Amino acid sequence: MASRGVNKVILVGNLGQDPEVRYMPNGGAVANITLATSESWRDKATGEMKEQTEWHRVVLFGKLAEVASEYLRKGSQVYIEGQLRTRKWTDQSGQDRYTTEVVVNVGGTMQMLGGRQGGGAPAGGNIGGGQPQGGWGQPQQPQGGNQFSGGAQSRPQQSAPAAPSNEPPMDFDDDIPF
């Protein structure tokens, strides 16, 4: 089976400004946000703490764009899953320009994190094709967070019933000999 590659971006960061929303001729919403992610480390030579911030352009489409425009504000913390896209455009002087963005389409996810800052969505709102939570390799969803996925219809979360175990419960009250 031939591999086509993987193009997936996961970001957790804070908005640098309020979302910019516009509408396409077909009525679909498009929201542009800038997301800051920061990394901290201690400089081995000086012992001083250093920090580097990266700014990411993120484009949300459809219902996700509408949700972002209504609930996200400058400083909001958000979890994003999308794809990298580079697009070409021509500036006013006729020069070709390129920009790389994280595009969040139907298969992507936007989840608001943190508390309700100045009135956010009610806790537990879930729109679209959210995936079951938990398991290895999947992001842990904070309690009370609001997850919005790009699916067109709302699906209830389904959890698998716990498999019965034949093992006795673990007893942690034993004395440890060391």
Swiss-Prot record:
List the biased-composition ranges (Low complexity). Answer: 138-165
One MF term in GO for this entry? single-stranded DNA binding
Q: Which UniProt keywords apply?
A: DNA damage, DNA recombination, DNA repair, DNA replication, DNA-binding, Phosphoprotein
Q: What is the effect of changing P25S?
A: Increased frequency of precise excision of transposon Tn10 derivatives (mutant SSB-202)
Q: Could you tell me which residues belong to the region Disordered? A: 113-178
Pfam family membership, one: SSB
What is stated about the way this protein's activity is regulated?
A: The C-terminal tail exerts an inhibitory effect on ssDNA binding.
GO-annotated biological processes: DNA replication; DNA-templated DNA replication; mismatch repair; recombinational repair; SOS response
Q: Composition bias, kind Gly residues: at what positions?
A: 115-137
Disulfide feature? none
In this chain the SSB domain maps to 6-111
Which residue ranges does the Swiss-Prot or TrEMBL entry mark as DNA-binding?
55-61
What the entry says about post-translational processing? Phosphorylated on tyrosine residue(s).
UniProt-reported outcome of changing H56Y: In SSB-1; destabilizes the tetramer
A cellular-component GO term for this protein = nucleoid
Q: Where is this motif: Important for interaction with partner proteins?
A: 173-178
**Quaternary structure, from the entry:** Homotetramer. Interacts, via its C-terminus, with many proteins involved in DNA metabolism such as DnaG, HolC, PriA, PriB, PriC, RecO, RecQ and SbcB. Interacts with RadD.
HAMAP family from the UniProt entry: SSB
Q: Which PANTHER family has this protein been placed in?
A: SINGLE-STRANDED DNA-BINDING PROTEIN
Database matches in NCBIfam families: PRK09010.1, ssb
Listed name of the protein: Single-stranded DNA-binding protein
Organism annotation: Escherichia coli (strain K12)
Recite the lineage of the species. Answer: Bacteria, Pseudomonadati, Pseudomonadota, Gammaproteobacteria, Enterobacterales
